[in-house]
Amino acid sequence: MFPNGLIAFAFGYLLGSIPFGMILTRIAGTQDLRSIGSGNIGATNVLRTGRRGLAAATLLGDMLKGTAAVVIALLLSGPGAAMAATLGAFLGHLFPVWLKFRGGKGVATYIGVLLGLFWPAALAFCAIWLLVAFTTRYSSLSALLASLTTPLLLWGFGHPQFALLFAVLTVLLWFKHRENIRRLFAGSEGRIGAKA
């Protein structure tokens, strides 16, 4: 099914581009996510609507689409295809064709592809995210700090190719969080659980 990395990348992109936050909130009759809070289509912004169940479902969907893309590519065509699917799924979430290439910030999908490629690093990411989130209640800061450690952890575990790939993904994640970074420095970033 995956004769080369390009097909695996395209497969990953299509799975990654499914906008679960938009789909679930529309089904639930909630207003357009892009018009509230941060304008993001991910779970943190869904949480700002006050719908915790929808936020959890969005988080799970955005994470598992990344995991599915990587695991399917890995099983059918090996690690090279899995890496291509990793990049494709992440870019699909960030720049989905269905939403005119204006997607989410990628945290859940980052965790999902990491889980599929090397699960111990995904657990470490989640542990760091939870620690920072518990102490600061800033979702964005939690993701930024956890993502910084991921390439280092992958390198330390003996996976330099994965480390390089996730260094690229981390740069993209930070780019998508540039407005959050500005708000963090300005002291105006929204905290976890705050409604729009």
Curated annotation (Swiss-Prot):
Q: Which cellular compartments is it found in?
A: Cell inner membrane
Entry EC number(s): 2.3.1.275
In terms of InterPro entries, this protein maps to:
G3P_acylTferase_PlsY
**Pathway where this protein functions:** Lipid metabolism; phospholipid metabolism
Q: TM segments?
A: 5-25, 70-90, 111-131, 152-172
Print the keywords alphabetically: Cell inner membrane, Cell membrane, Lipid biosynthesis, Lipid metabolism, Membrane, Phospholipid biosynthesis, Phospholipid metabolism, Transferase, Transmembrane, Transmembrane helix
**Cystine residue pairs:** none
Question: What functional role does this protein have?
Answer: Catalyzes the transfer of an acyl group from acyl-phosphate (acyl-PO(4)) to glycerol-3-phosphate (G3P) to form lysophosphatidic acid (LPA). This enzyme utilizes acyl-phosphate as fatty acyl donor, but not acyl-CoA or acyl-ACP.
UniProt subunit comment: Probably interacts with PlsX.
This chain belongs to which protein, by name?
Glycerol-3-phosphate acyltransferase
Q: What is the lineage of its organism?
A: Bacteria, Pseudomonadati, Pseudomonadota, Alphaproteobacteria, Hyphomicrobiales
What would be the name of the gene that encodes this protein?
plsY
